[in-house]
Amino acid sequence: MSVNDPIGDMLTRIRNACMARHTTVTMPASKMKIAIADILKREGFIRDYTVIDDGKPYKTISITLKYMPDRRPAITGLRRVSKPGLRVYTKRADIPRVRGGLGLSILSTPKGVLADHEAWRARVGGEVLCYVW
């Protein structure tokens, strides 16, 4: 199946798995998806992720979701910002704050895929990929 927006597909799979209270979700892997999963793990939104290379022509990524003690998902919401039909770019000074700083913006910058506070410290702007809260 051809997917026009692989990042949007990744976010939708994570959102649906959280709503269904699944423990893991798998999807085709790419460098961008692995970088996003790494940021989500560092920021505490997911428990872990693994890249699976089982000899097929493509790799898959398995994300272990994180839940609170009362079984509420750690990820309350995900929103794709920059889409293939409408790219959204921001300067360093205009990096958006999500939910008053409780959420996270993920940006694709010249220095790689970074969280909003990392991009601020690195003094770079870039394409706003998504918001997570």
Swiss-Prot record:
* Key word Transport present: no
Origin, by domain of life?
Bacteria
The GO cellular component terms are: ribonucleoprotein complex; ribosome
A Pfam match: Ribosomal_S8
InterPro entries linked to this entry? Ribosomal_uS8, Ribosomal_uS8_sf
GO BP field:
translation
Q: Which GO terms describe its molecular function?
A: rRNA binding; structural constituent of ribosome
Keywords from the named record: Ribonucleoprotein, Ribosomal protein, RNA-binding, rRNA-binding
Specify whether RNA-binding is a keyword of the entry.
yes
Q: How does it assemble?
A: Part of the 30S ribosomal subunit. Contacts proteins S5 and S12.
Q: Which NCBIfam families match?
A: PRK00136.1
Instruction: State the similarity comment.
Output: Belongs to the universal ribosomal protein uS8 family.
Describe the task this protein carries out. One of the primary rRNA binding proteins, it binds directly to 16S rRNA central domain where it helps coordinate assembly of the platform of the 30S subunit.
Query: Which PANTHER family does the UniProt entry name for this protein?
Result: 40S RIBOSOMAL PROTEIN S15A
**What is the designated name of this protein?**
Small ribosomal subunit protein uS8
